[in-house]
Structures are given as C-alpha cells and as structure tokens.
C-alpha cells in the first residue's frame, strides 16, 4: 500500500511541477516585455499553484484566524520546507529564503521565479537586507520570514531573532505572528520536520509514502510595531507563538 501511495502521489506531484515550470517560464517571458510589471500576475499564479501543491501533500490542513487585509510582516515558527507552500496558499506572500535554496534542482528556480528574496546568512549586511525587505512592505506586499533562523522538530520554539524585524519598523507595518503545528495520531509528527542532514528528495519520499498527517495553522493577533524596538517586537511575536503552540 505504501508503494502504491508513493507512486500515485509522486505522479500527481510531478504533474504539478511540470505545470509550475510552464507557468514560471510564461511569467519570465512576460517579464521581458518593455515596461511590464508582472508582480500581480506572479503573485496570483504563485498562490494558485501553491494551493494545488498543498492539496497534493499528505496533510489535512486546518486554519484558525483570518489573514490580514493590510500588508504585514508575517513571522512563523519553522518546521519544514512545507511551511512555505502551506502559508503561501493563504495569502499573496513574498518569501525570504537562505541563498542555498536557489541551488536546489527545479525547486530553487521555481522559488526564484515566484519572487523569493534570497539572503546569504552571515553576510553581515543586515542594513541592506532590511532595506530590501522594507521596500517590499512599502509596496503593499506581505512578507514572510522565519525568525528562528532554522527548522526545528516542532516540539520547541527557538529564540526569534530581531534582526529582520527592523523592516516592519522601517515600513511602519504590523507583525502577523503565525503558529504552525504538525500532528500525526495525536502526537507531534516525526515525519514532517525537515531538520539535520535531511535532503529534499528523501524527505519528500518519506512524506509521500506515509499516512496523512494534520497541520494546524494559527493566524494570531497582529502586533503593532509603533513604539517598539526590534528586540521587543521579536519577543512579543515569540511569546504569541509559544502560547499558541504549547
């Protein structure tokens, strides 16, 4: 049964990847037209495609709360690469990712064409990075970051680093805390976390072979940034996530 499940889910996923490559190539061609602004089109297609990707992943998804209507800096705990499509299907989001993801076969190219902003960890140029992030927020775009800086097994919450929170202060927007919890058979899901020496294909294979798990996404009360510094903003966002998860 596990083998059949893997084959059927893999076939569906490969079809989606082929569709995504076609959509990304089309957007790339549109980008080359003089004066073309493909950002709205890219965001619509990205959200549409991510919703289909989520449907192909072996998760039952439950969402609590409402997505904000105003542009905000979304901050979430980070368990797996699957966090990105799950959140990206809820609202038009600009993603922030480590530079290494750009080198991933197919997935890196798709991420780039979806408008992902890549940063090199440890580059030391945090001011320039925050300027790039604030520019996205000033343009009315939601931005998603994972302030823990790495993935966890979902059973704990690491410190939220305030370095990238400065973009919300500079743009004068609120922070949208998000709590993501993966469960299987009533306990934390051991298959969902993408941690340690995991590689994308091996992790995906484990997910596709297994039974369906569940994901609970909580869109928590937004945190106004006015009057706060980045450390306090990070502390409040982390506290909101901890209370929701544990």
Regions from the PLM with identified roles:
Residues 106-109, 122, 155-232, 236:
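A cross-family acyltransferase "interaction/gating" segment
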Residues 98, 119, 146, 178-180:
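Generic beta-sheet signal
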Residues 71-73, 140-146, 216:
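Residue-level preference for the first positions of well-ordered beta-strands
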Residues 20, 24-34, 38-40, 55-56, ...:
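Catalytic core of membrane glycerolipid acyltransferases/transacylases, capturing the structured
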Residues 136-165:
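Catalytic-site beta-strand/loop segments enriched in glycine and acidic/polar residues
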């Amino acid at each position: 049964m596990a083998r059949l499940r893997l084959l059927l889910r893999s076939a569906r996923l490969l079809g989606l990847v082929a569709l995504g490559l076609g959509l990304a190539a089309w957007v790339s061609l549109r980008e080359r037209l003089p004066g073309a602004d493909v950002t709205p089109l890219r965001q619509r297609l990205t959200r549409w495609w991510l919703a289909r990707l989520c449907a192909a992943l072996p998760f039952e998804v439950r969402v609590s709360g409402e997505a904000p209507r105003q542009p905000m800096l979304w901050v979430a705990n980070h368990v797996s690469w699957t966090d990105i499509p799950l959140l990206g299907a809820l609202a038009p989001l600009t993603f922030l990712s480590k530079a290494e993801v750009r080198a991933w076969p197919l997935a890196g190219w798709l991420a780039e064409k979806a408008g992902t902003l890549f940063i090199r960890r440890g580059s030391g140029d945090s001011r320039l990075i925050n300027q790039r992030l604030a520019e996205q927020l000033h343009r009315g775009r939601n931005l998603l970051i994972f302030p823990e800086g790495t993935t966890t097994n979902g059973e704990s919450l690491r410190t939220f680093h305030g370095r990238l929170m400065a973009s919300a202060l500079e743009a004068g927007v609120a922070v949208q805390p998000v709590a993501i919890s993966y469960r299987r058979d009533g306990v934390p899901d051991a298959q969902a976390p993408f941690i340690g020496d995991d590689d994308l294909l091996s992790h995906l294979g484990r997910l596709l072979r297994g039974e369906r798990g569940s994901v609970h996404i909580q869109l928590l009360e937004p945190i106004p940034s006015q009057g706060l510094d980045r450390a306090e903003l990070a502390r409040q966002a982390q506290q909101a996530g901890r209370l929701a998860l544990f």
